[in-house]
Amino acid sequence: RSLAASKKQYHLLAITPSFVQGEYWEAISEGIDKAASEMESYNITITKLFFDQYNNKTFDDIIRNLLNEKVDGVLIATLFTDSVIRLSQELDRNEIPYVYVDSNIGGQHQLAYFGTESYDAGVIAARLLMDRLSSSSDILMARIIHSGKNDSNQGKNRREGFCHYLTETGFNGNLHEVELKINDSVYNFMKLDEIFEANPNINGAVIFNSTCYILGNYLKARGMQSVKLVGYDLIGRNTQ
């Protein structure tokens, strides 16, 4: 019996980060909209719920009352590992199927995962960077903070793969870390000026999410194109 002939209504939830135009998650949201349009004739509706990808509490606020309504399946962006595991276990108890997007989490019962292997992506980033640097060059690792200091599951895995590759290949430079803000260029320029002035041997930089443009804009403004930069996601601002 086909879904189209059935009178049963199916309700799916998609829990993903909010975004502004041109960001990585905009493309994900557009894909969900396309799926919703295609599945409408099969009595399937999709409700999109958004959280702040830099604030774990906003994710927890969404899922707190998630099961108070009828839900037949859930798509989960897996940025916050502990919270996603708690949600997954609750869905398991209620026999509600779910899938992951962005990064995978082992030991759960997701039907599928859609995304890249984050750890391997970190290894590839390190390899690309070190192909262009000497083993004694210093590297800047940047992370973006917002309302709280939560690293995404994907970012953690990428960072782990990146550092493991450096360790295994005899890297003997120094790693420098800096925390930047998503919408505060004055603060970011100040922090980056400080760290580059104090560490003139920094010849490479990496950021483990889709905000590579923040570092790229700084390096361009300061005339530091000789610093090799690696980032992720072919969104418009990262390729300009």
Over which residues does each language-model region extend?
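Basic, Lys/Arg-rich alpha-helical nucleic-acid-recognition elements, primarily the DNA-binding modules
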Residues: 1-2
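Amphipathic helical "hinge" segments at domain boundaries
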Residues: 6-61
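Short beta-strand elements in bilobed, periplasmic/extracellular small-molecule ligand-binding domains
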Residues: 36-56, 140-141, 163-186
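Short helix-capping segments at alpha-helix termini
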Residues: 38-42, 94, 166-173, 199, ...
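Hydrophobic alpha-helical
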Residues: 74-92, 162, 178-237
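An alpha-beta-alpha
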Residues: 125-169
